Amino acid sequence: MSIFPQMRYFSCIFLLLFTLTICERVKSGNQLLTPLPQDPLIQVYFNNSESSEYRETYRQKTRLGDDLETQIVDTIAQAKSTVDIAVQELRLPKIAQILAQKQKEGVKIRLILESNYSRPWSSFTSAEIAKLGKREQERYQDFQKFVDINQDHQITSEEISQLDALLIVKNAQIPLIDDTADGSKGSNLMHHKFVVVDHRFVIITSANFTLSDTSGDFTNPSSLGNNNNLLKIDSPELATLLTQEFNIMWGDGVGGKQDSKFGLQKPPRQPKTITLGNSKITVHFSPISPTQPWNLSSNGLIDQTLSTSTKTVDLALFVFSDQQLANTLENLHDQEVQIRALIEPQFAYRPYSEALDMMGFSLSDNCKYEVDNRPWKNPISTVGVPILPQGDLLHHKFAVIDHQTVITGSHNWSEAANHGNDEILIVIENPTIANHFQREFNRLYSKIKTGLPANIQSKIDAEVKQCPQIQKPSSSTISTPTKINLNIATQAELETLPGVGKKLAQKIIIARQQQKFTSLEDVGKIPGISDKTLAKWEGIIIW
């Protein structure tokens, strides 16, 4: 695909100027693995694949991997009528540029973002930047260095207008909403990462549209990007399912009624299964209310899929904190299914991490184990964390089952994803697809640290010494009120109500602090609570 003139011009600037500064030119000496066959209707890509290489646009270095940004750009570039994108964060200029170009050509573009990431970096004031957390301030500093094309430490409006992705989107007047479009302060997390083009072509990925999730942190030469996967699927039937999810969130769009639905405001739907060529595909959208049966949730679908295993289960997960899934894996292990697991290091050893269970350990938090915690009686030694370049993360959310079936998408294996976030989970039964994910798992598993780190063992020992008795809470003994008093309920209790996430629960608490509720009319005055929501609460709330 030919990039339009503006992008060619700035690519040249990158090529000429960055060579003299922080750019790292690396001659291709990579030993590539033989590429695996791709399914004609479902292509699989990994940003750290060892069977391909590409030259980065921004840092101008040749490296191993698939260029995920280019895959997204090329898919959008073929659009003739429509492009719908729902993604947590969009910071990649080439994607913004192609969206602007396609809109000029008359293609209908719609974009949904997470409200925490829906502003151009360049729009932040000094006071706002000062209030950002450490990680976000570091990201802002990376952005400043990224847009300073000539590296003169003087950022111009021209530089910003070409490289601040959301400013490009804004200047192109591309229709954009976020999860505050329902009148709330935002849902739990709009965590989707999908694209639908011309009601036919679909991208589903674990990657946000950022440098760190695709090619790597701009100012860190050793960074190769958080490890992610991307699926390109040619299926009008699948595109229809994703468009339905998109339309629920979109409502009537920009500046219209506050009829968008996010999080638990969305109607619950059952998983949908389609046949596409040689593949059987099942799709489910999160979240689901914790008052609904767990087996109907996305984690429930994961559980059902894991339970089919008779040979092997390999996991590569950013977060793993769902106890019931760990219990299912233990049952499979007891049936001699071989299980291997890789967990992102920053989450692998938290008190809620199921990696600890799989290794046979428990770590309490303030003298209390997680609810229903169950360390394995026959622990395994095939649980570990990958050794990655400094700053890079294991951002995958996939499992490979019996070399036949793949579970992937944006959905982390956690309660937050299951009961709070807007997510997509996709299960694909096709050995050709599974082979790609198996190769990716094997690559990551070839460089790992297994076992319990000494500092975590010290934490466990310290908790045992400091706590007279460590509580072992059980869901069977935790009382759940049949009716919830809105004037005294805890935030956790409020979040069990249909349609209530963290942010709405907080708004209820703030409202009652100002004036106690005495009627449904009082409750209905809270932004984000509709008549339909109140109808769902009938018989389960009091004041």
Where are these regions (language model features)?
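Small-residue hinge/turn detector
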Residues: 501-502, 530
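Short catalytic-loop micro-motif centered on adjacent basic/acidic residues
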Residues: 83-87, 177-178, 312-317, 341-342
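HKD-type phospholipase D/PLD-like phosphodiesterase module
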Residues: 31-79, 89-307, 344-404, 411-426, ...
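Alpha-helical interaction/regulatory segments in DNA maintenance proteins
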Residues: 509-510, 514, 524-543
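Acidic, Ser/Thr/Pro/Gly-enriched interdomain connector segments
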Residues: 472-498
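Acidic-and-aromatic substrate-binding clefts and catalytic sites of carbohydrate-active enzymes
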Residues: 87-94, 318-324
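C-terminal motif of bacterial Sec signal peptides marking the signal peptidase cleavage site
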Residues: 21-22
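Long, C-terminal catalytic modules of enzymes
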Residues: 387, 391-396, 401-477
